[in-house]
């Protein structure tokens, strides 16, 4: 909705400043590395930080790239180094514990945001958390456990939205859960 603002760090600053001035709760911002290139990534991130955002997430692709190509680790590392007052969350191509580890340990982000990979592996959050809490890398789930997750998702969604809607929604997700990464 606001990707065009990636061309104008001053606009980002003024909009974030205006929003934070009327909120009494934390505001987080997620942005891409840029519109068609990442030349303004650091400036955009610093604009949001100086305007009072509580945390910043950045997807390592430009708006033009959408979901093609690869996450721009170099740009995320530059932004991570520049952002010093708030948590910086890296996003893009986090499909495994090793991807999360690389972002945190090598790029210097404070946290990671998992996106599309969770559609194939909802267990990824448990795997990443366990690794950072204990150093243990959990193996891929066996098929029966994946089936349990799909069934639990169906039950919970049914409780929330009703059986008919839940079945329709889980029908598209269950094959991805069972197939895995």
What are these regions (language model features)?
Residues 1-7, 58-68:
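Glycine-rich, proline-tolerant flexible connector loops at the mouths of alpha/beta enzymes
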Residues 4, 29-41:
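Active-site mouth loops of central-metabolism enzymes
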Residues 10, 14-17, 22-24, 38-55, ...:
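Alpha/beta catalytic cores of nucleotide-metabolism and tRNA/nucleoside-modifying enzymes
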Residues 29-33, 60, 90-92, 116:
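A cross-domain feature marking catalytic cores of carbohydrate-active enzymes
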């Amino acid at each position: 909705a606001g990707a065009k603002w990636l061309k104008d760090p001053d606009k980002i600053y003024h909009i974030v400043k205006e929003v934070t001035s009327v909120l009494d709760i934390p505001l987080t911002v997620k942005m891409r590395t840029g519109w068609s290139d990442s030349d303004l990534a650091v400036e955009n991130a610093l604009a949001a930080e100086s305007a009072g955002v509580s945390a910043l997430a950045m997807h390592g692709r430009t708006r033009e790239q959408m979901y093609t190509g690869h996450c721009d680790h170099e740009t995320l590392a530059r932004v991570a180094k520049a952002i010093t007052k708030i948590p910086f969350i890296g996003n893009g191509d986090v499909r495994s514990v090793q991807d999360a580890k690389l972002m945190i340990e090598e790029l210097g982000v404070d946290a990671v945001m998992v996106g599309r990979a969770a559609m194939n592996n909802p267990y990824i959050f448990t795997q990443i958390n366990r690794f950072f809490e204990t150093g243990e890398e959990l193996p891929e789930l066996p098929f029966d456990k994946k089936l349990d997750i799909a069934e639990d998702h169906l039950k919970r969604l049914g409780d929330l939205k009703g059986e008919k809607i839940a079945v329709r929604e889980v029908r598209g997700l269950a094959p991805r859960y069972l197939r895995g990464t």
